[in-house]
Regions:
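Extracellular carbohydrate recognition
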Residues: 45-52, 142-160
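Short beta-strands within extracellular/lumenal beta-sheet-rich domains
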Residues: 44-63, 119-121
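Extracellular beta-strand ligand-recognition surfaces/modules
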Residues: 70, 119-149
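Extended, low-complexity, turn-rich repeat/linker tracts enriched in Gly/Pro/Ser/Thr and Asp/Glu
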Residues: 60-64, 73-82, 144-147
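Surface-exposed binding patches on compact interaction domains or structured appendages
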Residues: 165-169, 173-175, 195-208
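Short, solvent-exposed loop/turn segments enriched in Ser/Thr/Gly
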Residues: 181-189
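Extracellular glycan-recognition surfaces and repeat-rich motifs
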Residues: 1-40
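Extracellular carbohydrate recognition and processing domains
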Residues: 97-130
């Protein structure tokens, strides 16, 4: 795909294009695929691998919205697996050094129960201190061989969509001291919304 970069940062294997066959519920869907499984690697000859699939340049300064979305599916996942898939923010403002950092607060499918299921992610970058032009990368780390079968698929990557419902609270956490027989007030909370079909409702739980 034009503008995408496919990097084998450690080892020689990278991502590749894949189309699901007739036996899969996603038959005919074209995706990016990655796995470290290799049946030809003999026991004891396993090697670490790291592959990065990088988006085209994304215009943070001028984009209609700051929403980054994608779908991911993991197959042959195992509880406590060491294979990892991360979404990374990439800044290339310094031509001599590429800055790469995993996006915090985001967990990719990595358990047996999540295997075979598509998951959709909406990452709202509004208010983040990012470069005017940036990149996103899907980084996979594993060990190439017969013991690491985890396989991931990426599809429907978008940036700048304006049709997604969004709620943005001014506060994500509230903390204050409450004393007996004395009123206590939290900081004021405002909520801005986009593309909602229903009114916003507030529910409080616990001993308030």
């Amino acid at each position: 795909i034009d503008g995408w970069k496919n990097l084998a940062q450690e080892g020689t294997r990278a991502w590749w294009g894949y189309e699901f066959g007739d036996t899969d519920e996603s038959v005919g869907e074209k995706v990016a695929k990655v796995t470290a499984y290799d049946s030809k690697v003999a026991d004891g000859d396993e090697t670490p691998v790291e592959m990065m699939l990088v988006t085209p340049a994304l215009d943070f300064k001028n984009s209609a919205s700051k929403m980054f979305t994608f779908r991911v599916r993991g197959d042959y996942l195992m509880d406590n697996q060491t294979d990892t898939l991360q979404l990374c923010y990439i800044d290339m403002e310094d031509p001599d050094e590429m800055y790469v950092a995993p996006v915090g607060g985001l967990t990719m499918p990595c358990t047996k129960d999540e295997s075979g299921e598509w998951n959709e992610y909406h990452i709202d970058l509004t208010g983040q201190d990012l470069a005017d032009v940036f990149f996103m990368g899907f980084r996979f780390k594993s060990i190439r061989g017969r013991e690491h079968a985890a396989t991931y698929y990426i599809d429907d990557v978008t940036y700048g969509r304006t049709d997604i419902p969004v709620m943005r609270p001014s506060e994500t956490q509230l903390a204050f001291v409450a004393l007996v027989n004395k009123d206590a007030e939290s900081a004021a909370v405002t909520v801005t919304t986009e593309n909602l079909a229903e009114p916003v409702k507030l529910t409080l739980g616990g001993a308030n």
